[in-house]
From Swiss-Prot:
The gene is dnaJ. Homodimer. This is Chaperone protein DnaJ. It comes from the Bacteria. CXXCXGXG motif repeats lie at residues 143-150, 159-166, 181-188, 195-202. The lineage of its organism: Bacteria, Pseudomonadati, Pseudomonadota, Gammaproteobacteria, Thiotrichales. Signal peptide: none annotated. Participates actively in the response to hyperosmotic and heat shock by preventing the aggregation of stress-denatured proteins and by disaggregating proteins, also in an autonomous, DnaK-independent fashion. Unfolded proteins bind initially to DnaJ; upon interaction with the DnaJ-bound protein, DnaK hydrolyzes its bound ATP, resulting in the formation of a stable complex. GrpE releases ADP from DnaK; ATP binding to DnaK triggers the release of the substrate protein, thus completing the reaction cycle.
Length: 374
């Protein structure tokens, strides 16, 4: 027998929001609940279908699996818990307002510990090779003196106001409202003899030393999550997480853009004219670069796979070196004389033969001036 579509059971669209799904369930559950329909087998079956549909569609994870794989994606979850029997009519309200004190269950609320953040500053070399850093962070941990109970005697008594539930429930007609117990702040218990170290909180701030492994290839702004290294949880709940924010310091030579590295490469006037070999630094050693004769300022040489390593996989970026031809300074009289002879040797038409860009620029200036003054 083919199973019915959960969306059709609740009479909602497949794009319905969580609020719309909850509203539809509440309306149908109140209509078909067995307490309202005693000895009505059809209503009982309908209520089971409604409850099962709501259990799946109200859970983001189950709903996603159902949308993708249909009933096969959620059947292994065991279906709706209500299929094995029914509680009182108030169960409907428990779904929306939390369980009532009439159930006698312990409502002491477990609270997950807070997440923490810590910024680690590393060099570009450390980002390239990866590094292990040791950090000290202040975080809330369970008090050793009272074993986290908050009590000198390590015992707690049930809160007289909420009877251990952690919440106080008020009912007005058909509707029930719940609020955190103001006496015990939702813990469900009270302490007669508060611990001197934690003042009854059960937690104390401590310095924790943690080793952080930073993988190769990390970039500025990346975050590393250390699960369970945040503040301690309450009433047996999980600890929070520690998020490490990566800050990569500026480098004296290289500028990073994604996986590529960029640098300026100064070369001498003679090297630019005649060509030759120069040593170029990279993050994992020097490489020899051949400079072709007549190299101009601004020319970019690409050294493949000499950039940053990838955070995921074995790929590497490139190193791009931009040439900057340096003009000689602090020349003595002999050197100046040689340069003057060199300039004379170029002849009157040196621009067309030896400085093509300069000639083009001056020609453009002349053409512009003629148009401007004509």
């Amino acid at each position: 027998m083919q199973q019915k579509c959960y969306y059709e059971i609740l009479n909602v669209s497949k794009t319905a929001s969580g609020v719309e799904i909850k509203r539809a369930y509440r309306k149908l559950a109140m209509k078909y609940h067995p307490d309202r329909n005693p000895d009505d087998k059809e209503a009982e079956i309908k209520f089971k279908e409604i409850s099962e549909a709501y259990e799946i569609l109200s859970d983001d994870g189950k709903r996603s699996r159902y949308d993708q794989f249909g009933h096969a994606g959620v059947n292994q979850q065991g279906g709706a818990g209500s299929a094995g029997g029914f509680g009182g009519f108030e169960d409907i309200f428990d779904t929306f307002f939390g369980g009532g004190t009439s159930r006698g269950s312990n409502r002491s609320r477990a609270s997950r510990g807070s997440d923490l953040e810590y910024t680690i500053e590393i060099s570009l070399e450390e980002a390239f090779f990866g590094v292990e850093k040791e950090i000290n962070i202040p975080r809330m941990e369970s008090c050793d003196s009272c074993d986290g109970t908050g009590s000198k005697s390590k015992t707690k008594t049930t809160c007289h106001a909420c009877h251990g539930q952690g919440t106080i429930r008020r009912q007005q007609g058909f509707f029930a409202f719940e609020q955190t117990c103001p006496v015990c702040n939702g813990t469900g218990s009270s302490i007669a003899d508060p611990c001197d170290d934690c003042y009854g909180s059960g937690k104390i701030k401590k310095q924790k030393t943690i080793k952080v492994k930073i993988p190769e290839g990390v970039d500025n702004g990346d975050r590393i999550r250390l699960q369970g290294e945040g503040d301690s949880g309450s009433n047996g709940a999980m600890n929070g997480d520690l998020y490490i924010q990566i800050l990569v310091k500026e480098h004296k030579i290289f500028e990073r853009r994604d996986m590529n590295l960029y640098c300026e490469m100064p070369i001498s006037f003679t090297k630019a004219c005649l060509g030759g070999e120069i040593k170029v630094p990279t993050l994992d050693g020097e490489v020899v670069l051949k400079v072709v004769p007549e190299t101009q300022t601004g020319k970019v040489f690409r050294l493949r796979e000499r950039g940053m390593k990838s955070l995921r996989g074995q790929r590497r970026g490139d190193l791009l070196c931009k040439v900057v031809v340096e003009t000689p300074i602090n020349l003595n009289s002999e050197q100046k004389e040689l340069l003057e002879k060199f300039a004379d040797s170029l002849g009157e038409d040196y621009q067309s033969k030896h400085s093509p860009k300069s000639k083009t620029w001056f020609d453009n200036v002349k053409d512009y001036a003629k148009k401007f003054f004509e």
